[in-house]
């Protein structure tokens, strides 16, 4: 039985190695940076919480497309290797790139399950 959800904590540990990383809203105006949103929900059995499952969106913002892509690829690599195993199971479910007002954004979406 799981007592505490740690998906956001682990994601922050992995992504903050590559870029300033924030939950929901950036606390900076300097590029590059990334923000994430997460909607963890417990999945119950008769014994209590079996696991948590979250839809997670990570968006990298930068004025330089190549740098945004490099940061995004590093985050993808770390999430897929660092959040798959006994404690977590992750899969990437989306990847989009956009440019608005000369700022590039690359959004990656994941489904992440936490088992321990």
Predicted regions and their residues:
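Oligomerization/assembly interface segments of phage tail-like spikes and tubes
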Residues: 50-66, 104-114
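Acidic-leaning, charged glycine-interspersed low-complexity segments
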Residues: 77-116
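Small/polar-rich, solvent-exposed N-terminal microdomains that initiate assembly or binding
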Residues: 1-48, 66, 73-77, 82, ...
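Glycine-rich loops and low-complexity Gly/Arg-rich segments
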Residues: 46-48, 59-63, 81-86, 116
């Amino acid at each position: 039985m799981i007592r505490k959800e740690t998906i956001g904590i682990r994601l922050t540990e992995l992504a903050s190695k590559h870029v300033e990383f924030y939950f929901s809203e950036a606390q900076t105006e300097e590029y590059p940076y990334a923000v994430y949103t997460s909607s963890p929900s417990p999945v119950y059995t008769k014994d209590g919480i079996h696991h948590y499952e979250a839809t997670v969106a990570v968006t990298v913002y930068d004025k330089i497309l190549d740098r945004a892509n490099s940061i995004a690829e590093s985050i993808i690599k770390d999430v897929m290797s660092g959040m798959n195993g006994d404690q977590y199971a992750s899969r990437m479910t989306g990847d989009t790139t956009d440019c608005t007002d000369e700022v590039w954004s690359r959004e990656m979406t994941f489904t992440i399950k936490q088992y321990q």
